[in-house]
Structure formats: structure tokens, C-alpha cells
Amino acid sequence: MTKKVLILSSSPRRGGNSDTLCNEFMRGAIESGNEAEKVFLRDKTIHYCTGCSTCSLHGKPCPQKDDAAEIIEKMVAADVIVMATPVYFYTMSAQMKTLIDRCCGLYTEMKNKEFYFIVTAAEDDRKLMERTVDTFQGFLDCLESPTIKGVVYGTCLLYTSPSPRDSTSSR
């Protein structure tokens, strides 16, 4: 059975460690006969949740005009969601956390999803990286019948220089 796979890459660097693993995951998903799409969060405008309760208490769409609604609709439509992040200060990137916070209005529609997590860090201590997975688990605890299918830990990965193709990189 063909599955719709949505890969959310929250690396701030195109071609960075977690983004590279996303590309490999996507290749494998397609080679296995699935549909796959990668959303590179860095290229999207996603505003912070303001806690206005328009979505949660009033059942109306978020009044913010950005790319979050489109991404969240893709999450609702997907069978499999891959959430990938570099680990900064022992947690997920701000880009990923901001998207998760914006899921408030439609999280009840994310039912029976399969999840994979990709976490990368310069650390070699997997236990420290598991803090990030625990944060993802907190999100899944709010969903109906999610299943964690796997976690990819990319450890001891160091960033040495910006990619020549990525002129917006900074140190």
C-alpha cells in the first residue's frame, strides 16, 4: 500500500546534517513505492502562536497569514510524518517547535499517524539527544493513536563551513 510521507526538515542549513538524512529518508520512501514530499521549514514563514485561542476555543482558522496552515494541512493528510531537527542546547530547533506550537487548531485531526524522528548533534551521548525525542513525544501525547516507527540519531556531526550554495549561512 502506497503511503503519503511528509518530511519536515527544520535544519537552518540546506544540505546540513539533518537535512541530508531527510533526503536519504525521502529517497528510501520513494524507492519503496511511497509518495514523499519534503518541506524545508527554513524556506517558510511561520509566525509564533500568540495564544489568541481563535483556533482552539472558537474553532476558526488561525488569523495569522503565513505558511503554517498549508504545512499543517499536509500533516493532517499524510500517513507518515518525519520530523527532523538538529539538536541545539539539548532540544529541537526553534523552527520545529514553532510549527508544533501552531498545530493547536488541527491537532485533533492528526489521527493514526506514523512518526519517524531524525535528530542530529555534535554530541556523541545519545542519552542527551533523547531529550529532543522526549519533546517530540510530548507533542505526540496530544494526538490520537500516533505510532513512533523509528528514531534516527546522527551523532558526532560537526559543522565546519557554510555551503557555497547557501549564501545566507552565517557563523
Predicted regions mapped to residue ranges:
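N-terminal beta1-alpha1-beta2 submodule of the flavodoxin-like/Rossmannoid cofactor-binding fold
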Residues: 1-84, 90-101, 105-106
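Short beta-strands and strand-loop turn motifs
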Residues: 8-9, 84, 117-121, 151-153
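Short histidine/acidic/glycine/proline-rich micro-motifs that form metal-
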Residues: 12-15, 87-90, 121-126, 157-158
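Short beta-strand elements in bilobed, periplasmic/extracellular small-molecule ligand-binding domains
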Residues: 36-38, 146-153
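Short beta->alpha junction loops
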Residues: 41-43, 153-158
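Short, proline-centered helix/strand-breaking motifs
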Residues: 85-86, 165
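Short, glycine-/small-residue-rich phosphate/pyrophosphate-handling segment
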Residues: 111-149
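Single conserved hydrophobic/aromatic residue that forms the stacking wall/gate
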Residues: 159-170
